[in-house]
């Protein structure tokens, strides 16, 4: 049995208290608690506490400490239930305490995976223009249930997906001006897959791109690569030269007809 002999406010935090006790051998420092625990257990000078009660006090103090760590972690941005659990595990908090903290956070509505998934979907689609496949994968990695994700993705209709994909195409295609039209389409296709768009949305967007095919830019790209390969292979003669040129330009996405026209032009220049 111990008797509380003194309670003092900590210098660095007005919400934490040092508790001094006497176990029969004079006053000594016992433990420190948060204000919430002080009030919850009715700690005051002269109160007698046994070992069982002391254990309860210290356990609840650990729960409160972990709870405040979680609140601080949440102050930067919303988190999922799993993210909070992972964070506390890294802080070496025991599973029993983690479960209590998470239950309290859920009760106090500091964490709500449904709300998180909806807001995350809106942000990633509107700001970062990610496709639904990537958004779903990221939410799964954050521990959000599949059913909740399916519901949140209803916030991202196909029309919006197409709008975003076309924006990404318009932004990216400028960097592919020296590529053939076919090669540019392949690279844009790969980019949209990485961004998380479905095959259906990608095909719709690339069909619109087909209508914008710029013959002048296609010729510029053909001449750019053709002249580069011409310098590389001109040391070869006849069939070997033409075969290497055709293979190289075909791999770049140019049609056989386009390649033949270019080679004919080079013959006429010689």
Curated annotation (Swiss-Prot):
> Per its UniProt record, what InterPro entries does this chain match?
RecX_HTH_1st, RecX_HTH_2nd, RecX_HTH_3rd, Regulatory_RecX, WH-like_DNA-bd_sf
Q: Note whether Methyltransferase occurs among the keywords.
A: no
What does the UniProt keyword field contain?
A: Cytoplasm
Top-level division of the source organism's lineage: Bacteria
Q: Which GO terms describe its cellular component?
A: cytoplasm
Primary location class: cytoplasm
Cellular compartment(s): Cytoplasm
The answer, when asked if Cytoplasm is one of the entry's keywords, is yes
Any single biological process term in GO: regulation of DNA repair
Q: Which PANTHER family match?
A: REGULATORY PROTEIN RECX FAMILY PROTEIN
NCBIfam families found in the cross-reference section: PRK14135.1
Report the family membership. Answer: Belongs to the RecX family.
Q: State what this protein does.
A: Modulates RecA activity.
Q: What is this protein called?
A: Regulatory protein RecX
* Biological source species: Bacillus cereus (strain ATCC 14579 / DSM 31 / CCUG 7414 / JCM 2152 / NBRC 15305 / NCIMB 9373 / NCTC 2599 / NRRL B-3711)
Print the organism lineage.
Answer: Bacteria, Bacillati, Bacillota, Bacilli, Bacillales
């Amino acid at each position: 049995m111990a008797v509380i002999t003194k309670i003092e406010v900590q210098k660095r935090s007005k919400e934490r208290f040092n508790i001094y006790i006497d176990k029969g051998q004079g006053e000594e420092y016992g433990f420190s608690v948060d204000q919430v625990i002080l009030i919850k257990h009715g700690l005051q000078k002269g109160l007698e506490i046994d070992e069982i009660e002391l254990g309860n006090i210290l356990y609840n103090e650990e729960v409160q400490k972990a709870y405040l760590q979680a609140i601080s972690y949440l102050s930067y941005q919303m988190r999922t239930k799993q993210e909070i659990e992972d964070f506390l595990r890294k802080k070496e908090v025991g599973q029993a305490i983690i479960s209590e903290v998470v239950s309290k956070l859920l009760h106090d509505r500091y964490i709500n995976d449904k709300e998180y998934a909806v807001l995350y979907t809106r942000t990633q689609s509107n700001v970062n223009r990610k496709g639904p496949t990537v958004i779903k994968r990221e939410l799964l990695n954050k521990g959000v249930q599949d059913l909740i994700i399916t519901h949140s993705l209803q916030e991202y209709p196909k029309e919006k997906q197409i709008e975003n994909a076309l924006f990404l195409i318009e932004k990216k295609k400028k960097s592919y001006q020296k590529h053939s039209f076919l090669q540019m389409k392949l690279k844009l296709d790969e980019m949209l897959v990485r961004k998380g768009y479905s095959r259906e949305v990608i095909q719709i967007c690339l069909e619109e791109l087909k209508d914008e095919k710029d013959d002048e830019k296609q010729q510029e790209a053909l001449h750019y690569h053709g002249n580069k390969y011409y310098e590389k292979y001109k040391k070869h003669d006849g069939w070997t030269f033409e075969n290497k040129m055709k293979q190289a330009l075909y791999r770049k996405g140019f049609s056989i007809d386009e390649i033949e026209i270019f080679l004919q032009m080079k013959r006429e220049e010689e």
